[in-house]
Regions:
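Non-heme di-metal
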Residues: 1-304
Length: 304
């Protein structure tokens, strides 16, 4: 029997409250103490240092590094003219840039740890630090392919305003799209893992290095997806499921490389039917799963 339920499984309000506390304990044990001034976490900082100390670099430069730098902020060449390795790396940058722009914009709008009054507020601040740690891992991925000149550039004034206002929206309104965004990232990382053997076959050391860094991110994103699910009641979870297809298509339409790398239709199917059994056992073992998504007796949690 499958050990896990769908991510869309119903959850009682008491269960969700208890799961926030459980997630908060897991997060601190997994990622360490918050270094708020650095937007960092102690254990995540150690993980990055280990990857950097390995100093793994690709055997060869990209066939045309100038092509990468010309297209990594915005595609200016015909994507069909780019080799798949360059397409993969320009896509990765654009995806990570959205993440970086979002967390940078909302950082000042989220209560500091000292001003956080609830577990969920502490989680929000802490999780932003985790996301900044992910950007540092992405940066190391580009350095792995000897791309040392990239810069993290804001998306523009309009998008910056959008991201800055997001924390001001009520939780019931923002939770469903935020949950779908996490599910979109998790689904993407699973598909990227499948692409690595094909696109990076000639760079086995760099491929494995990137895969391990993506695994670190995937472990966190799996936990973030469950944590985001925890905010949502029955109406919101039904709305979330209906949002998957339009949100996925709208997001990937803005990343031209995705048409040449990803099967977005398949990703939508996987997200709509997602349960934790789809993940590798070692990833699940290092991550966090809500209690109501496990096939364990639930008698200890009272109804509400």
């Amino acid at each position: 029997m499958n050990s896990y339920r769908s991510i869309f499984s119903p959850a009682r309000s008491r269960e969700r409250r208890d799961n926030f506390e459980d997630y908060w304990i897991y997060s601190q044990d997994h990622a360490g103490e918050i270094l708020e001034d650095e937007r960092n976490l102690t254990r995540k900082k150690e993980v990055l240092t280990r990857f950097q100390n390995l100093a793994i670099r690709s055997r060869s430069l990209l066939s045309d590094p100038k092509s990468f730098y010309r297209n990594y902020l915005r595609i200016v060449d015909d994507p069909r003219s780019l080799d798949r390795k360059t397409l993969l790396l320009t896509f990765l940058y654009k995806f990570a840039r959205h993440e970086w722009a979002g967390i940078s914009a909302v950082w000042d709008g989220i209560p500091t740890m000292a001003r956080s009054r609830s577990t969920t507020e502490k989680i929000s601040r802490y999780r932003l630090c985790e996301e900044f740690c992910h950007i540092r891992l992405f940066h190391e991925m580009f350095r792995t392919f000897q791309l040392d000149q990239i810069e993290w550039v804001p998306l523009g004034k309009w998008m910056g305003r959008v991201y800055r206002y997001l924390p001001k929206f009520p939780e019931w309104l923002m939770s469903p799209p935020a949950f779908v965004s996490e599910l979109m990232g998790l689904t993407l990382y699973r598909h990227l893992d499948r692409l690595l053997d094909d696109i990076l076959a000639d760079e086995p050391e760099a491929r494995d290095h990137v895969r391990m860094m993506l695994r670190e991110i995937m472990i966190d994103e799996l936990a973030h997806t469950g944590q985001r699910r925890n905010f949502i009641g029955p109406i919101g979870i039904a709305a979330s499921r209906r949002m998957i297809a339009p949100m996925f298509r709208m997001f990937y339409r803005d990343l031209p490389e995705s048409a040449y790398l990803l099967d977005v239709g398949k990703m939508i199917e996987e997200a709509t039917a997602f349960d934790y059994s789809a993940m590798a056992p070692d990833v699940i073992a290092s991550s966090w799963v809500p209690s109501y998504c496990r096939r364990e007796p639930r008698t200890s949690v009272s109804a509400s």
